[in-house]
Amino acid sequence: MPRNVPEVNGVYRHGACELWCRAMAHALLKRSGVRRGLGGREGPLKRLRLAVEDFVRTTSESEACESRSAVARSRPGGRKSRKELRKEKRHLRKARRLQRTVGSGSGDQGGNVGLNDGPETRRPPTEVRPTPAKATATPAKASAPSTNTKASAAQPKAKAKGAPGKPGPATATARKRALLAANEEEDREIRKLERCLGLHKRKKKGDGSSVPLSFARDGLDYILGALECGSGGGLYESSEEEEEEKLETGQTVLESDLESNSKESEEDPDWQVLQEDQEDVNSKRRGEAESGTRGNKGTKKVRFAEVVEKSRSSSEDDIEQQESHSVESGEKYIPPRLRNEEVIDVHKKEELDRLKKHVKGLINRLSEPNMASISGQLEELYMAHSRKDMNDTLTTALMDACVTASAMPSRLMMEHVFLVSILHHTVGIEVGACFLEAVVKKFDAIYRDGGEGKELDNLFTMIAHLYNFHVVQSILIFDILKKLVGTFTEKDIELILLMLKNVGFALRKDDALSLKELITEAQTQASGAGNKFQDQNRVRFMLETMLALKNNDLRKIPGYNPEPVEKLKKLQRTLVRNAGSGSETRLRISWDGILNAEQTGRWWIVGSAWSGTPMIDNSHHIQLQKPLAGMASSKMLELARKQRMNTDVRRIIFCTLMTSEDFLDAFEKLLKLGLKDQQEREIVHILMDCCLQEKTYNPFYAFLASKFCDYERRFQMTFQFSIWDKFRDLENLPDTKFSNLVHLLAHLLRTKSLPLSVLKVVEFSELDKPRVHFLRRVLTALLMETEDDDLAVIFSRVSDNPKLGMLREGLKLFIGHFLLKHTQAHQSAEEASLLREKAGLASKSLQGKAILRM
C-alpha cells in the first residue's frame, strides 16, 4: 500500500484509496494516448478499470481486518498521540488535493464512471471477527489487573481501526517492556507516597498481602481485601461484565469516542462515510454479542462469587494474623472512640494544669489583708469550673502548702484553714467536706505508718482550726481524742496537748460532759501506765492541763492566746454575712464515718447513703431499748402511765429524762436510743409536756431543749412547731403552764437556739388579752436578762429579711405601746430606766444594722 494514503484512527480510509487508484489508472490512460471519444479501444480500458477496482476492494478488506487486530495488540490504551493525529491530517489534506486534481483533469465519461461505481466501494465488507489480544504478562502488583482491564475494554474500539502494517516481534517486545517499566514506576511512586504518609506495611505469611497497621486500627483491612493479590481478578471480571452490559444496551467504547469527536467530524464528508460503514458493522456485532453475553453471563457471576469468597477468607486470615501479631509484639488495639477520649483527655489535662497554676498562685499570695480578694477570685473559679476539679485542685494546693516535714507557723496555718472556712460558707459545704476528708485520711495513713516528722502535728492543727472556724462539729474532735487516749503513747500525749491547747475551752463550752468523760478516761490510763514512760513530766503536764480545762482556769495553760482566732472569727462574720449556704453549715460527722465513706457513701453529696448508716442495724437499737425498759422502776413506770405515756418509745424517753443526772447526761442517753425520724419528734413533745407539767419552772428542760436545737436543725424546727401549737391554745393554759412556757421561750430566744422569727405567726393587729400578757412577759424577760451585744444580734437577725416586714413593724409597735406604757406601775425606777434603754436598742436593731452602728 502506498505511503501517501491517509490513515484516520489506525484505519485506512477506503474512499481515499479508491480515489488514488482511479487517479493512477487515469494517468496510465493519458500516457498511452487514450482520449475521450475513442471507442475502438474502449473494451481493453474497461477491463483494466474493472481489474483495478477489484484489486482495490479486496486489498482494502484484507488490510482493514489485519489492521484492526494489529492495532488492538499494539495500543493498549486505544488512542494515538498528538503527533500521529497531525500526520493523519496532513495525509488527509493531501488526498483531498489529489481528488480535486483528478476530478478537474478527467473527462465527463471517466468521471461518471467513477461516480457510478462509488457506492459499490462503500458496501460494507464481510466481517471477519478478530480474536481479542491477550495480556502479555501478569504483574505481581495490583496495578496490573487494572491495566489489563483497560486493554480489554479498548478491544471493541480497536476492532474498528486499521493499521499501516502488521507490527513485528520487536515492536511487541518493546511495548511489553514499556508496560512493565510503567508498572514499576507506578509502584515506586506508591511506595514513596506510603513513606510520606507513614503507612508502613507489615510482612504477612503465605499468599496474603501486607496491610498497614493504621488501616487495621481503623477497621479498613477488610475493605482493602479487594485490592490484594488473590482478589484482583474480581475487579477484572467485574469490569468485563460491565462492558458486556454496555454492549447489550448498545453503548460501546467506540460509540462514546465517536460521540465525543462528533463536533470535529461534522465538517468532514469522508468521515461521515466511514461512520456509516462503522454503524453497519456495529449492528451485526450487537446481534452476535447478545447471544454470546447471555451464555457467558452466568459463568462470570459464578467466578466473581468465588473470588469474593476467596477475598473474604483471605481478609479473615489477615485479621487473625494481625491479632496474633499484636499479641506477640505487645501492641494493644485502641478503638477510635478511646482514641478520641485520649485527645479529649489531653485538652482536659492542659486545662487542669492552667487551673492548678492559677490556684497555687493565689495560695502563695494568701494573707489576712487580701483574704477577701483571694476568696472572691476562688469563688469565681468555682463558678467557671466544675466543683470536683476545683475541690481537688484547692485541696492539693493547701495540702502541699501546709503538710510539711517541719512545723508550720500557727498564724500561717490559721490563714489557710480560714480560707477553707470562707469558701465552705460562701460556695457550699462540699468544699469543707472534701478538704476535711483529705486531711483525716492523710492523718490516719501517717499515724498508722508511725511517721516521725511534724506532718501529724500539722494535720492535727488543721483539724483543730476547722473546728474553731465552724466547719466541723465537736463529735469528730472527741472521736480523735478518745482514739489517742485509748492507745496512750508519748506521741499520743503530745497530740492531745496540742489539741487541748487550740480548742480546749471551745470543747468545754460545746460539750462539757464529753470532755469530763475524756478527762476521767485519761486519768485512768495515766494511773495504769505506771513506769511505762521515761518522761513522767509530760503525762503530769497533760493531766494538769485537763484539770485546768475542767475548772475553767486559763492561767494554768501555758501559751494559750485566743486573740488571733477571735480576730479571724470576727473577719469571718463580716465575709459570710450574706452567704446563702444555710443557717447550719457545721458538719456533724464522726471519725469512722469519714474513713468508711467509700463503703457507706459520702454524706455531703445529695442522695448519698451516709444519712441512713446510723440506722442500718436496727437489732442493736432494740437490744438497747429492752435493758432501759427493764432498768426503770415500777414507781417510774407508774408515773409515766399517769402522764399518758402510752407507748414504749414515750415511756423510754420519759424514764430517761427523769433518771438523768443533768441535761448533758440526758442528752447523751437520748441520742444513744437511736430513735428514727418520727420517734425523735417524741423527744421534743415529751420534753415540752414535762416542762409545762412542773409546778415551778425547772431550767433543766430549757437547757436540754437548747442543746437539741444546737445539735440538729430538725429539732429546732420541731420545737418551733410545738410552740406555735401552744400559741393557738394560750387562753386554755393554766397559770403554771403559762408561766413555764414564757420562761422556756425566753431562754430559747436568749441563747439563740430559736430565732425571733418564731413570733411571726402572731397577729399583732388582732391581739387579745392572753396574747398581750404572754408577749409582754416574754419580751420583758428577753430584754432584761440579755447582754447588749447579744440583744442587738437577736433583733438584727430579722431586719434584713424582706418577708419579715410585718413582724418588725408589729414588734416596734408592741414595744412602744404595750411594753413601755405601764413600766412605772409594776417596776422600780431603775428597772424601768433599764427597760427603756434596752427597748430603744432593740428598736434600732429592728431598723437595720447601719442605724445601729451610727
UniProtKB/Swiss-Prot annotation:
GO terms for biological process: hair follicle maturation. This is Nucleolar MIF4G domain-containing protein 1. Residues 76-99 have a biased composition (Basic residues). One of its GO terms (molecular function) is RNA binding. Residues 648-764 form the MI domain. Residues 66-215, 231-333 are annotated as: Disordered. It comes from the Eukaryota. The keyword Nucleus applies.
